[in-house]
């Protein structure tokens, strides 16, 4: 069975999904990125299934190599953008924890509301 055209098409689909994920990450559309992840995983599984059935010829491998390199490059860029986002979220969580600690330590002052005053004397 010659599945070369189907395999090539599957790789093209994976490239498109990879480019979409990179665009979403670049635009910081995190919810959409996460939603698109399953389609990407399914496309990878489809390619794995096709290559298990019949190994691609050397010629086909040479044709697919540029697509693979593009996908790997996109994946690396997406991972970098995700790491930046995770660092931002970790910083926000840290700030939130500090605020919670401060409120817990100083918030209950025997029913008195602590507020700065313009004139102390």
UniProtKB/Swiss-Prot annotation:
Q: Mention one GO biological process in which this protein takes part, according to its record.
A: negative regulation of bacterial-type flagellum assembly
Record GO cellular component, one term: cytosol
* Primary localisation category: cytoplasm
Location(s), subcellular: Cytoplasm, Cytosol
Question: Which parts of this chain are annotated as the region FliD binding?
Answer: 60-98
Q: Organism's domain of life?
A: Bacteria
Question: Residues annotated as region Required for homodimerization?
Answer: 1-50
Answer yes or no on keyword Repressor: yes
Q: Which Pfam families match?
A: FliT
Q: Which keywords, in A-to-Z order, does the entry hold?
A: Bacterial flagellum biogenesis, Chaperone, Cytoplasm, Repressor, Transcription, Transcription regulation
The protein's matches in HAMAP family, at most eight in alphabetical order, are given as: FliT
| NCBIfam families per the UniProt record, alphabetical | PRK10548.1
Family, according to the entry, reads as follows: Belongs to the FliT family.
This molecule's function is given as:
Dual-function protein that regulates the transcription of class 2 flagellar operons and that also acts as an export chaperone for the filament-capping protein FliD. As a transcriptional regulator, acts as an anti-FlhDC factor; it directly binds FlhC, thus inhibiting the binding of the FlhC/FlhD complex to class 2 promoters, resulting in decreased expression of class 2 flagellar operons. As a chaperone, effects FliD transition to the membrane by preventing its premature polymerization, and by directing it to the export apparatus.
Q: How does it assemble?
A: Homodimer. Interacts with FliD and FlhC.
Listed name of the protein: Flagellar protein FliT
- Report which gene this protein is encoded by: fliT
């Amino acid at each position: 069975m010659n599945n070369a055209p189907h395999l090539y098409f599957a790789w093209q689909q994976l490239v498109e999904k990879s480019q979409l994920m990179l665009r979403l990450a670049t635009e910081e559309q995190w919810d959409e990125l996460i939603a698109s992840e399953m389609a990407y995983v399914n496309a990878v599984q489809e390619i794995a299934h096709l290559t298990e059935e019949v190994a691609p010829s050397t010629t086909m491998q040479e044709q697919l190599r540029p697509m693979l390199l593009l996908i790997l490059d996109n994946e690396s860029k997406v991972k970098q953008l995700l790491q930046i986002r995770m660092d931002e979220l970790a910083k926000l969580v840290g700030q939130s924890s500090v605020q919670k600690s401060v409120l817990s330590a100083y918030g209950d002052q025997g029913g008195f509301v602590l507020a700065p005053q313009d004139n102390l004397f």
